């Protein structure tokens, strides 16, 4: 019952103390079903009352205990047909009433079982639908999460690619600047060296105090033992050199 209809629930019933088919084993009846079963007993009680009144008046017309002499002529006059007694009629009514009650209660029980089965099927269907919906939502969440992660990965890859391009451009620009600086520095160095060489070459000076220098050398060669005799020439030579230096500084200052 419920989710799988192939396996049925075993249901048994029995008589209670009032001989009503209301005791079930295997299923719990709701209060609504019990009330309906109680309502179904009301016509039966009326019929039982009428049957009881019939049995009360029956002994006057049909005595239940008659002697052999009383019953025998009656059977002879009717041609051998036996008339039903009051006790038999009451028992037959009671059995029919019990059977009708059994059928009504059985129909109510079957209706209740069908309702329970329908409710269990609906409950199982709702649970299955909820489970499918939950699984679908979980799948959608996982899919959205995967899409979000993939999008973030693409964004990070694009950012890394952009940074790589930026740093390559910066490195290339720095290399170009360094190369330009080196070229300018080399040109400036060569220009400065060339200018310095030209300035040095242009400054060709004649020897100063050549006459005094020759006189001193001659004096030293002649007075090897008495070089103090050449001291006056040495003083004049120093004065001449000092004057030439002052003149040079004044001209190029």
Curated annotation (Swiss-Prot):
Topology relative to the lipid bilayer, per the entry, is: Lipid-anchor
Q: Which UniProt keywords apply?
A: Coiled coil, Disulfide bond, Lipoprotein, Membrane, Mitochondrion, Mitochondrion inner membrane, Myristate
Coiled coil (UniProt feature): 94-178
PROSITE patterns membership: CHCH (PS51808)
For region Disordered, the annotated ranges are 1-89
What are the residue boundaries of the CHCH domain, all occurrences included? 206-248
> Which parts of the sequence form the motif Cx9C motif 1?
209-219
Q: Does the keyword Methyltransferase apply?
A: no
Q: Subcellular localization, per the record?
A: Mitochondrion inner membrane
Keyword Coiled coil listed: yes
GO CC terms in record = MICOS complex; mitochondrial inner membrane; mitochondrion
**Residue stretches of biased makeup (Low complexity):** 48-64
One biological process term in Gene Ontology: DNA damage response
Tell me the InterPro entries matching this sequence. Answer: MIC19/MIC25, MIC25
Q: Where is this motif: Cx9C motif 2?
A: 230-240
- State the disulfide connectivity: 209-240, 219-230
Record field: compositional bias (Basic and acidic residues): 28-44
Where is a lipid covalently linked (N-myristoyl glycine)?
2
Pfam assignment, any one: MIC19_MIC25
Q: What does this protein do?
A: Component of the MICOS complex, a large protein complex of the mitochondrial inner membrane that plays crucial roles in the maintenance of crista junctions, inner membrane architecture, and formation of contact sites to the outer membrane.
What family does this chain come from, according to its entry?
Answer: Belongs to the MICOS complex subunit Mic19 family. Metazoan Mic25 subfamily.
- Subunit details: Component of the mitochondrial contact site and cristae organizing system (MICOS) complex (also known as MINOS or MitOS complex).
Stated name of the protein: MICOS complex subunit mic25
Native species:
Xenopus tropicalis (Western clawed frog)
């Amino acid at each position: 019952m419920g989710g799988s209809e192939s396996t049925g629930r075993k249901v048994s019933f029995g008589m209670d103390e009032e001989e009503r088919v209301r005791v079930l084993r295997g299923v719990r009846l709701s209060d609504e079903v019990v009330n309906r079963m109680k309502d179904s007993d009301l016509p039966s009680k009326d019929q039982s009352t009428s049957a009881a009144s019939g049995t009360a008046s029956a002994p006057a017309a049909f005595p239940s205990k008659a002697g052999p002499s009383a019953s025998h002529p009656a059977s002879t006059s009717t041609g051998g047909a036996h008339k039903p007694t009051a006790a038999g009629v009451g028992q037959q009514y009671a059995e029919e009433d019990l059977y009708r009650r059994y059928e009504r209660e059985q129909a109510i029980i079957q209706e209740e079982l069908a309702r329970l089965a329908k409710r269990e099927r609906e409950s199982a269907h709702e649970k299955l639908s909820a489970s499918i919906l939950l699984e679908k939502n979980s799948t959608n969440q996982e899919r959205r999460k995967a899409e979000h992660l993939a999008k973030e990965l693409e964004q990070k890859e694009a950012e890394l690619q952009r940074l790589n391009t930026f740093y390559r451009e910066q490195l290339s620009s720095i290399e170009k600047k360094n190369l330009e600086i080196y070229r300018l520095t080399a040109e400036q160095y060569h220009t400065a060296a060339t200018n310095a060489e030209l300035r040095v070459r242009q400054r060709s000076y004649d020897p100063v105090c050549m006459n005094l220098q020759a006189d001193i050398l001659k004096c030293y060669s002649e007075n090897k033992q008495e070089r103090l005799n050449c001291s006056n020439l040495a003083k004049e030579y120093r004065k001449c050199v000092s004057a030439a230096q002052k003149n040079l500084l004044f001209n190029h200052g």
